[in-house]
Amino acid sequence: MTGQSRIGVTGLAVMGANLARNIARHGVPVAVHNRTGARTTEFIEAYGDEGEFTGTQSLQEFVDALERPRRIIVMVKAGKPVDGVITELTPLLDEGDIIIDAGNSHFPDTVRRTAECAANGIRFMGVGVSGGEEGALLGPSIMPGGDPEAYAEVKDVFEAIAAQVDGTPCVVHVGPGGAGHYVKMVHNGIEYADMQLIVEAYDLLTHVAGLDAPAIGKIFEEWNSGDLESFLIEITGKVLAKVDEKTGGPLVDVIVDRAGQKGTGTWTAIDALGLGIPLTGITEAVFARGLSALRDERKKASTTLAGPNPSAAEDRTDLVDDIRQALYASKVVAYAQGFAQMRAASLQNDWNLDLGAMATIWRGGCIIRAQFLNRIRDAYAEHPDLDNLLMVPYFTEAVANAQDAWRRVVVTATEQGVAIPAFSSSLSYYDGYRRERGPANLIQGLRDFFGAHTYERIDAEGSFHTRWAQDGTEVRTD
Ligand code: NBP
């Protein structure tokens, strides 16, 4: 039996429901399904008149409602539920049908599921979707990975429902296998770094500039009209301006300082460690959330461990602008690192990622959407094989101009005892990256001393070992 729905969505919690509504609102007939049937009934009751929906109560009914090849978006909780749905769907599907996992799956799972589905003649796509609840409904940034021929079957739908910036939809086929979910993972990692940089600026503005939340909210509002213009800077202004109904003071002042996380930042950092890519901005952001969670330990340490207590500066005019520049320079570094990571993963996995296209599809719909991404898109358009974004004249110059302020902020924060892990590690990365000769010569010497790991010389080919504990002579080992 062949149904009439062009595409199906199973999993009607907030993301799946909004994605299904977005698709139907674009005139595409959608079959919907949810494990708990009552949710489907409620969905049809609430939104049934927004488009051409077919509500189904069983997976058999669901697959029967779809055109061939069947195109099925799975929007269930990431992890085991995705495998469960694939297992249940597989016997009901035909050769060439397409399963699209649009949740936040970890990319190695996507690689495995692609192979498992292929063994059953099913085409599997791992698709990153960013933008949260509102993006799913009004236009997300979509990062589809998997078989390009399978993508061709859904391209028109994805392009219709994605956010649009300057007439360009925020969706592009990212690459094969796990590439889509990989890129979504790095997107989320960059989101962690962006947020950490924002909170470090907030901390300094509070404790070193001596400003209160509404005043800082206004500063973020101003910053949002310059180089920093972005969704996260914009909402920072709004969150800081919010008044708590209960206390009459700023809401942010009564929110517990313990950050949650769902794991995508950790995945990004772990992957960077495996690739050997320095990813200090994102990784420090993950560690900072970890430190924030040690609330009880911090409470004890706050009365035990010595250190300066920050005191508000008398003249804050220059300080506020210095903090803005430090935020911008650190942000450039965090993005340079994230893009370097995607480049390394692309080379390792033969994904052939178009990094300029990634910047292009992140300009709208997603959480890190920003003006700044236009600059990154331009950089890759001019230099497709770029090693590091810092080397493009625009960014080289931007960081060069900001660096005096950036260094002042790191010094001031350190003197005043304000933790700035992302600001300071970004500056250290910058200083390390711009050194032709670093100090790792000594590491090699030490490794050779205790483990005969050998070293190379700057003045001769080959590898060498010194008999440190014996006669001290050097021998060539290759
Ligand atoms: P949740 O992640 O909260 O998952 C709830 C859905 O999964 C419900 O439809 C539930 O069905 C279904 N489900 C579960 Br739980 N176990 C199942 C199983 N074994 N078999 C079949 N269905 C099962 O939903 P969400 O917040 O809409 O997110 C969906 C995906 O999108 C996740 O991967 C999430 O990480 C990702 N994502 C979320 C956001 C966001 O802002 N929330 C943003 C971007 C991406 P039930 O109704 O029967 O319990």
Where do the language-model regions lie?
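Hydrophobic beta-strand scaffold residues
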Residues: V30, G55, F124-M125, L279, ...
